[in-house]
Amino acid sequence: MTIRTGRAALVAAAAIASLTAGTSLLAHGNVTPQAVDTSALPDIEGGNDNWIAENPYTGNAKAIAIGESAYGQNCARCHGLEAISGGIAPDLRYLELGPSGDEWFVERFRNGSSHDGKVYMPPFGEVLGQKAGWAIRAWLETKYTDE
């Protein structure tokens, strides 16, 4: 392989990597929600229509397992594996524990986030429901760090 051919291959590889990264950035907020089986979890008073203010599944091992799976299917694409963000979306390990963190989580989970007509996070509340949302939050609580 000549230097010229090697250099051309390197430039082509860099161009492909740039296009792939750009496509990933544009895809942010364009997520098709994946169903979450929450039938093993206790029902929440109010169902999906009347969201409660605090996580009823904190520390519930079954909810944490369901939440981990649901996060991997629906959240990791933007927020990163194990809730460690690559910098595009908030790193959810730093989401406060307790009522203030619950409030922030529910607002974003239910309604998503958009600014100036750009969708940064689609709403998941109606599609996945309250039980799945709180299960994801229960799992996120196990990843909390203040460092």
Predicted regions and their residues:
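Bacterial N-terminal signal peptides
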Residues: V11-T20
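Bacterial N-terminal signal peptides that target proteins for export
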Residues: T2-A12
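The canonical Cys-X-X-Cys-His
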Residues: G67, Y71-L81, F105, M121, ...
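Gly/Gly-Pro-rich "capping" loops immediately C-terminal to redox-active cysteine motifs
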Residues: I64-I66, G80-R110
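Electrostatic cytochrome c docking/interface patches
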Residues: A35-A70
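N-terminal signal peptide c-region/cleavage motif recognized by signal peptidases
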Residues: G22-S24
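Axial heme c-ligation environment in periplasmic c-type cytochrome domains
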Residues: A27-V36, G86-Y94, N111-Y144
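Short sequence/structural segments immediately N-terminal
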Residues: A70, T145-E147
